């Protein structure tokens, strides 16, 4: 079999091409865990990323870990002024957004009915619901047709876990946003939701071993997920691999929601 040099070059080009080559991504709440893993993978796949975080020290550390093609912008997704500053920086530096991953979130676990406070409720909905909505709304002027919006939900919005009333409701609202925005942006920008199950991140660090074992016991795969596994799902939704996918809820939960 004789293969021309041009065919070899074409094959090598396709096999070595990166899924997010020359794309601009914004990832909120990306100083640790799933969002940081996603930022790293996006850069590996050719993207330039803007990441946000509330604490400057953690943000600086994340930028250093990512290593290249990244700008860190200190800010709180629940504060409108911080969002305005974020997107002004993105506009000034890159002029556009190809991928938006609204990942910033907040939640108190282990808060059953009777122990919920007004502050806990307000803080959770301010970041998870209000923050998600205005993150997307303020990003839209910089997004072009063909762009991808990814929202971060949670298995808690699908299943009924004791002690998660407020957090679960906030994440169910995120799922609802995706349905509505898919209808509003149809044919232009894709909107999808990633719904992680129990992932081995700092969010679960404050739980007792008994509580952790309880979560793992209901996962058919018998383990917590890894941040990189969420990143891989985000890469799929960000890239052209999902060009005909919009409005979905991609459950990355080891099968928890199915049993």
Where are the regions that the model predicts?
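Catalytic Tyr-X3-Lys loop
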Residues: 114-134, 150, 170, 174
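Alpha-helical segment proximal to the catalytic Tyr-Lys
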Residues: 141, 182-187, 243
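Conserved glycine-rich cofactor-binding loop
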Residues: 24, 31-32
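Substrate-binding pocket helix/loop in short-chain dehydrogenase/reductase
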Residues: 111-113, 117-125, 204, 211, ...
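C-terminal substrate-recognition "lid" of short-chain dehydrogenase/reductases
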Residues: 142, 223-252, 257-258
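Short C-terminal tail/terminal secondary-structure segment
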Residues: 7, 11, 15, 107-110, ...
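Residue(s) in the substrate-gating loop at a strand-loop-helix junction
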Residues: 154
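A short, exposed helix-loop element centered on a Lys and neighboring polar residues
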Residues: 136-137, 179
């Amino acid at each position: 079999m004789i293969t021309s040099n041009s065919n070899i070059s074409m094959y090598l080009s396709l096999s070595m091409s990166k899924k997010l080559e020359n794309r601009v991504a914004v990832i909120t709440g990306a100083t640790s865990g799933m969002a940081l893993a996603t930022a790293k993978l996006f850069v590996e796949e050719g993207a330039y990323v803007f990441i946000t975080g509330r604490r400057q020290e953690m943000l600086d550390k994340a930028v250093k870990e990512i290593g290249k093609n990244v700008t860190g912008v200190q800010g709180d997704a629940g504060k409108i002024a911080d969002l305005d500053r974020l997107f002004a920086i993105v506009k000034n530096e890159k002029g556009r957004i190809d991928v938006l991953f609204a990942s910033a979130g907040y939640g108190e676990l282990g808060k059953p009915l009777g122990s919920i406070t007004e502050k806990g409720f307000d803080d959770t909905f301010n970041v998870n619901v209000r923050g998600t909505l205005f993150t997307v709304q303020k990003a839209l002027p910089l997004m072009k047709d063909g762009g991808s919006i990814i929202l971060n939900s949670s298995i808690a919005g699908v299943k009924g876990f004791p002690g998660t009333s407020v957090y679960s409701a906030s994440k169910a609202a995120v799922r609802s946003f995706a349905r509505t925005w898919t209808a509003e942006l149809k044919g232009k920008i894709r909107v999808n939701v990633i719904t992680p199950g129990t992932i081995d991140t700092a969010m679960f660090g404050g739980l007792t071993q008994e509580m952790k074992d309880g979560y793992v016991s209901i996962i058919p795969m018998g383990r917590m997920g890894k941040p990189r596994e969420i990143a891989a799902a985000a890469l799929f939704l960000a890239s052209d691999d999902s060009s005909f996918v919009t409005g979905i809820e991609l459950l990355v939960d080891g099968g928890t929601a199915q049993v």
